[in-house]
Amino acid sequence: MSDKEAFTEHDWRRLLTSLGEDPNRPGLHETPARVAKAWKHWTSGYDQDPVSVLKAFEDGAEQYNELIVVRGIPVYSHCEHHLAPFFGKATVGYLPNGKIVGLSKLTRLVDIFSKRLQVQERMTMQIANALMEVLEPKAVGVVVKCRHMCMESRGIRTQGEETITSCMLGELQPNLALRTEFLALARD
């Protein structure tokens, strides 16, 4: 067990004790280890380089010059303000400029950034900026729609509200027709 896991497991044991629970009782005995493992998974994006997943193909398809859009990409993250989960779907698209990536790479990119403590607005921009930096496409668009448990389970306690963020780079900024096409493809 690494120092990071042991420290985290110890902290979860202390949290249970501070709540008045007995971390050694049957239902909680293994909870600190399980929670430590879960948080390691939920924050594994810090150990991954987004650039490494965006290797361009060289198979002839790089001549494709229309929008490539993947929608319905799962987002599971935790807000950096309360450590509360937020979850939803992302749509990622780009207009290639001689380089394309496998479609699953867009999903992996979203996964890397969502497995960090985040705010949705920054995560949306990070996804778009990474794609723009590595592929140098003519345009990038990212739309993220999530429910935030920090709003639903505490504070205002509203159920089912969704927050939608977007980031448009390159030709999607000035080109209204291209932006409209991307947003139409991004709709559920």
Where is each model-derived feature located?
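A domain-level signal for the structural core that forms small-molecule/cofactor-binding pockets
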Residues: 1-188
